[in-house]
Amino acid sequence: MPELPEVETVRKGLEKLLNDFYIERIEVLKERSIASNGGSKSFIVSVKNSYLGSWERRGKYLIGSLLTKEKFSKGFLVVHLRMTGQFKLLEKEVLACKHTRVRFFDERGRELRFIDIRNFGQMWHVPSSRSIPEIVSGIKRLGPEPFSDDFNSHYLEEYLKKKTRSIKSALLDQETVAGVGNIYADETLFDAGINPKKESRNLKSTELKRLCNSLVKILNISIGEGGTTFSDFRDLEGINGNYGGQAWVYRRSGKNCKKCGEKILREKICGRSTHWCPNCQK
């Protein structure tokens, strides 16, 4: 599943390449891709005849502003890529591939195509008269952004002080911190030198400070590399993310730790495959 760095990479691409994209026509090939009330018919009526304006990211959600030709607000287009969703910009209309779910066409004949192999990705139209969390309920439950002032060791200490679950489980919970998934939870815990099985409430203040610093560091490095591609992720221009080759532990089970030489372990923690070094992470 695309995590914060991959979604941020897509956000940057959407903002860079679509600043003059006026949606003239929409085709919805898979009804379940549209999650807002009224289904695809209402979605098409609401979103077409709009400019795609600026793009923001909240956790793993993409939020695009919709504007009239006079640059008045028409609300927002909200997208969650889920497991395998990706956007592709085509300079001219070509035959839809098997996993194409939604197609947006502009006045110049360009196509913004949403492709989703697993078909879990979703889109919402949020009218300007409503708040985004009213329509997209998942956004209500998100914790602070890792790069925000609200995310710090004091916040984590207070939030986790009664949590008996593992710190790996806590990091994957979007209510703890928004946008972190399996890849960057593993990489962060390695960088911070923390055992992923350790109970959240038992982490010391010094460990929580390291955890915050490591998360921001790892995410920034991955964003700079365009995210991680292990299977389906591509940016808007079809380019793979490059962070995977730099991974310290993720998908390196059985290989030697790059720091100490110990074998990297892989085991299930909170139902997720977890990669870690038993020597470096205490």
From Swiss-Prot:
The keyword Iron does not apply. Coiled coil: none annotated. PROSITE patterns: FPG_CAT, ZF_FPG_1, ZF_FPG_2. The active site is at P2 (schiff-base intermediate with dna), E3 (proton donor), K60 (proton donor), R272 (proton donor). GO terms for biological process: base-excision repair. Keywords: DNA damage, DNA repair, DNA-binding, Glycosidase, Hydrolase, Lyase, Metal-binding, Multifunctional enzyme, Zinc, Zinc-finger. DNA binds at H99, R118, K163. Its EC number is 3.2.2.23, 4.2.99.18. It catalyses: Hydrolysis of DNA containing ring-opened 7-methylguanine residues, releasing 2,6-diamino-4-hydroxy-5-(N-methyl)formamidopyrimidine; 2'-deoxyribonucleotide-(2'-deoxyribose 5'-phosphate)-2'-deoxyribonucleotide-DNA = a 3'-end 2'-deoxyribonucleotide-(2,3-dehydro-2,3-deoxyribose 5'-phosphate)-DNA + a 5'-end 5'-phospho-2'-deoxyribonucleoside-DNA + H(+). Monomer. NCBIfam families: fpg, PRK01103.1, PRK13945.1. Belongs to the FPG family. Involved in base excision repair of DNA damaged by oxidation or by mutagenic agents. Acts as a DNA glycosylase that recognizes and removes damaged bases. Has a preference for oxidized purines, such as 7,8-dihydro-8-oxoguanine (8-oxoG). Has AP (apurinic/apyrimidinic) lyase activity and introduces nicks in the DNA strand. Cleaves the DNA backbone by beta-delta elimination to generate a single-strand break at the site of the removed base with both 3'- and 5'-phosphates. This is Formamidopyrimidine-DNA glycosylase.
